Amino acid sequence: MLSTAPAQAAQHQDANEYAIWNFHGATGFWNIDQRVQITQKANHSYWAMMWDFTATPGNGGYMGLQTDGTRFNHTTGDTAIFSLWNANAGRGSCGPFGGEGTGLSCRLAYAIDRQTDYRLRVWRLNADTGGQWWGAWIRNMKTGVDTAIGSLRVPRNQTLLGVPSNFSEYFGTAVACDKVPQSVAYFTQPAANAQGNGTYRYGSTYERSTRGRCTGGNVRLVDLGRTKAAKVTLGGR
């Protein structure tokens, strides 16, 4: 029997660009902060900071901003996201995810302004009998408003973060590799373990980049004056 249901378009694969940072041997952080500014948006795109837990290499989480993101209240649009693999509880607008492992994700509507930079923050919270809690916030650096994305609990041994990296990804409908919609994001040098007054125990420098096999793009280190940033261009030829 032939189905009369419309065929679902395939999702694009391998359209990503990664920026890798060097903390010069330091690892095991209870906090990581980083700013991002998305100066050119594209549909169905994700700009994120990601990390592993030192106790479980290859297993960690990510946070960032998406266009056309799907939220747990069944709405879509610009979205702030915080996700941890193997999370067992959440506080906020959170729910399960799958496809690339399993865990929990917190998602909320959050408008992306191309003229504004945002501080991404992940921070270790309290522990309880069920495990270790982590929280994520996004701050609009123009208004100074901090917004909590949510809190997630992971197994008790996941108490420290490894060195972070960044990625820009297109996750929309499959297109030709040279037709991936172009986006541009600036990720500043991430820093760890905030000491107050804008200072940190650990800083980083840009190391290298990698790109998926089905997209154009590049990463360039640029000097912003107060800091440097990885300018991540994804898509195009």
Residue ranges and their predicted role:
Residues M1-A9:
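Secretory targeting and sorting signals
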Residues A10-C94, R107, N193-R237:
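Secretory/extracellular carbohydrate-interaction modules
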Residues F23, A109-A111, L125:
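Residues embedded in well-ordered secondary-structure elements
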Residues V36-Q40, R124-N126, N140, Y170:
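Short beta-strand segments enriched in hydrophobic/aromatic residues
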Residues F72-T75, T79, A87-A89, P96-G98, ...:
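Lectin-type carbohydrate-recognition ectodomains
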Residues G95-R119:
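Short, aromatic/His-centered strand-loop micro-motif at the edge of beta-sheets
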Residues D113-W134:
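Localized edge beta-strand/strand-to-loop motifs within extracellular or lumenal beta-rich domains
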Residues G130-V219, L224-T227:
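Aromatic sugar-binding interfaces of carbohydrate-active proteins
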